[in-house]
Amino acid sequence: MSVCTLSVPVSSLSPGRRCNTFSDSGILGCVPINSNTDEEDVVEEKMVAEGVNKEAKQPAKKKRKKGLRIKGKRRRKKLILAKKFSKDLGSGRPVADAPALLASNDPEQDEESLFESNIEKQIYLPSTRAKTSIVWHFFHVDPQYTWRAICNLCEKSVSRGKPGSHLGTSTLQRHLQARHSPHWTRANKFGVASGEEDFTLDVSLSPSSGSNGSFEYIPTDPLDDNRMGKKHDKSASDALRAERGRFLIKSNIVKHALIPGTRAKTSAVWNFFYTDPQHISRAVCNICKRSVSRGRPGSHLGTSTLQRHLQATHPIHWAVANKDSGAVANGLDEAETERSDLLSDTLHGEKSTGSQDLTAEDLSDSDSDEPMLEVENRSESPIPVAEQGTLMRAQERETTCCGNPVSSHISQAIIQMIVEDMHPYNYFSTPAFQRFMQIVAPDYRLPSETYFFTKAVPQLYDCVREKIFLTLENVQSQKIHLTVDIWTHDPSTDYFIVTVHWVSLETASFLNNGRIPDFRKWAVLCVTGLAKDCLITNILQELNDQIGLWLSPNFLIPSFIVSDNSSNVVHAIKDGGFTHVPCFLHCLNMVIQDFFCEHKSIENMLVAARKTCHHFSHSVKARQILQEFQNDHQLPWKNLKQDETGHWISTFYMLKWLLEHCYSVHHSLGRASGVVLTSLQWTLMTYVCDILKPFEEATQKVSVKTAGLNQVLPLIHHLLLSLQKLREDFQVRGITQALNLVDSLSLKLETDTLLSAMLKSKPCILATLLDPCFKNSLEDFFPQGADLETYKQFLAEEVCNYMESSPEICQIPTSEASCPSVTVGADSFTSSLKEGTSSSGSVDSSAVDNVALGSKSFMFPSAVAVVDEYFKEKYSEFSGGDDPLIYWQRKISIWPALTQVAIQYLSCPMCSWQSECIFTKNSHFHPKQIMSLDFDNIEQLMFLKMNLKNVNYDYSTLVLSWDPEQNEVVQSSEKEILP
């Protein structure tokens, strides 16, 4: 326990009165303390007041002294609180109030009130106990609420327990694992020694690191050398990639010496164990994944229990390790030493391969019978028979719970239900479910709720993150795209979602099986909770963190970022130097919502329609009457469609449902009071549905995987043509009200600010140019005043930039160059490269270097020739769907530079339909459901739900293990907590 000193000036009170005042409070010590002041101003002798008035025994002349004199000079005494403090901070007044007591005007009241308040109110100073946990390098105690700690990275206040109870660090560890997993993993890997300097995360990234400990992405020039590093410096980055790739794995990896400041681990047991990153007083076995205690926290942590675990559970491994440890000294043959190396390599193989365990059967196949007998004799001798039997029975229970394949499959299925169906953790702890499991699998022991929350789901979360990270390592294109969404489903929290999109042209087997290939890939990088009042800097910082975490280690560069028109998000993207593309679906939604608000008749009709649907959805009797009427008249029945606030498509489906059941609804509403839809409103509802029908079709086209920026201009053109046809139809029929509605919506569609910006944006126009389906009818899609030749020059500049940055990709292989069908349409730039080839047909390296270092004016005519050749080629429809990437996959060897530019523009999505499907159609993400789950863990669950089907994760590869005895203790404690 560390000692905290408080300097208190001596007042006019006599020592006797002061000791009488302090005698009822506890033990007061005055000891010499070294300080920066003069030696004469420090107390050199110890005086202890133990609750007995010793001043009564002193001579009267000493009582008349105004202060304490030592060696003839007046001193200032140092009061030291020797009363035993609690190991954690109490719930009393914050420590920050102590200096205020010292600054009081009355010295006598200062000394008495300070000491009494520290003893009676139990104000525990922060330095009363050394913080040995590594989490304290990322947290500091909240000065206002001492039972909470503030994260140094995100400044979030995290609770450590209830006031007055034990304050631990488990919640702080879970916060670091969920919100700052790279920082926490690398801290465990490299360590922070007690008493050393503060730990700083040293991550080698192409982006620069911010001063606040998080990543700051700085976009570079397109022709910068960093963008060419993926091709030129790939060998030099292998070490960085291997090191950064391991940040995702916090389990199933042998981590030696996780806790810094400890002595070197010389015991042989550490070849079979690694320190548990969540509980430093426990160690995890590399063979069976069981967590074994090394002692009580805060006491001496030995290896005796680890040795007993190896002797009882893995006697063969332990005996061979003991035998091999003396191989050199005893002069054993080389075969024995090689077997030792093989065993050691097998045990440590989990660092790179996962979980390949060496069992006793594997050793028995390779070793003779005599060493086996010797091993058994050596393993039985060190421990008593009774203790060995107890450990063996515990191992049998663990094998029954974890080693049984059926039990593993059941546990994996439960985790799958938690993630995919968003079941709460306590659902599997209910008596009904436990009775069901007793009938289905009597021998299965259900893990505790805490196990699923703290071990199973985080382990699955890490595995999926690792798989996504390894997939991004193999992305061929250097430029990828991001979609950013913020969804509000919590009273105090918004969820920040970042999704990455890229293209992989390696899927070439569709010609054999006849299926359309899926070139477009995507993955959710993060689901992070942000405060409602988060600033632009917080959003930009989180975006830079994700880019530095996922993209920069793989030399990937964000080309376009798609988001809605939220002011904070748009400003954050632009302030970061990124290219922002508005979400097409959000633009349509804003146009139609403004159209609804502009017409009062439509608003009144929607209010009546919502009341009608609410009447049938909340009244069982009304719903039964409606269904009976449908059955009596043999009318088809469809489920009721509810309207969602802020989404026009749900409003359209609600109106469409009412029109399909208009006869039944009108008949049923006659019996209900207060719910009426007039005939004029029914007619207006028909007009609105006819007008919105083209927009619903456009939404369906946008929500498919193959939709990209190439369809923005054609879809807007198609919507305007559809509204024009509707206007002509209404004009022929003489419906004035419908004509006014069509004209109003057409005007809004043409004058909308966001849509007008998208029509004139360079990414959308170039993406349309690179779609072979639209290249022959571009004049119909282009806005007024746009020049086609100007945008062809822009496209040629993009091709020229790519030729200059990646000249080696623009070469044609020798085998392909010899084919006449390929060389006919080859790049002019590639043809110039071929002129520098030698007689043997190989490309001259000096010629390639000269071209690569040539001026941009030399490459631009070649790029223009490639673009002209693309537009002159006649495009014919082919069987393969509407995805233009199928066309460009066939042209990658003919126009390599133009193909790469086409992939860059065609791979950008029009909207973020992935998060749309999760948050708008899935009822599991209601605010009540989210608030009932843990905040840090709900982010992991949403991340898994959005990624598991996309990455095709195999649950059978998830290795699960738990301690049955500890599981029973946790389950019993959970039952006591539950009402």
Swiss-Prot record:
Keywords: Cytoplasm, DNA-binding, Metal-binding, Nucleus, Phosphoprotein, Repeat, Repressor, Transcription, Transcription regulation, Zinc, Zinc-finger. Zn(2+) 2 binds at C285, C288, H309, H314. Residues 337-351 have a biased composition (Basic and acidic residues). Residues 1-89 are annotated as: Required for nucleolar localization. This is Zinc finger BED domain-containing protein 6. PROSITE patterns: ZF_BED. Residues 359-373 have a biased composition (Acidic residues). The modification Phosphoserine is found at S381. The gene is ZBED6. Encoded by an exapted DNA transposon located in an intron of the ZC3H11A gene. Expressed in pancreatic islet cells (at protein level). One of its GO terms (biological process) is negative regulation of muscle cell differentiation. It comes from the Eukaryota. Transcriptional repressor which binds to the consensus sequence 5'-GCTCGC-3', transcription regulation may be tissue-specific. Regulates the expression of target genes such as: IGF2, PGAP6/TMEM8, ENHO, and PIANP. Acts as a transcriptional repressor of growth factor IGF2, thereby negatively regulating postnatal growth of muscles and internal organs, especially in females. Negatively regulates myoblast differentiation and myoblast mitochondrial activity via its regulation of IGF2 transcription. Its main location: nucleus. InterPro entries: HATC_C_dom, RNaseH-like_sf, Zinc_finger_BED, Znf_BED, Znf_C2H2_sf. Residues 866-948 are annotated as: HATC (Hobo-Ac-Tam3) domain. It comes from Homo sapiens (Human).
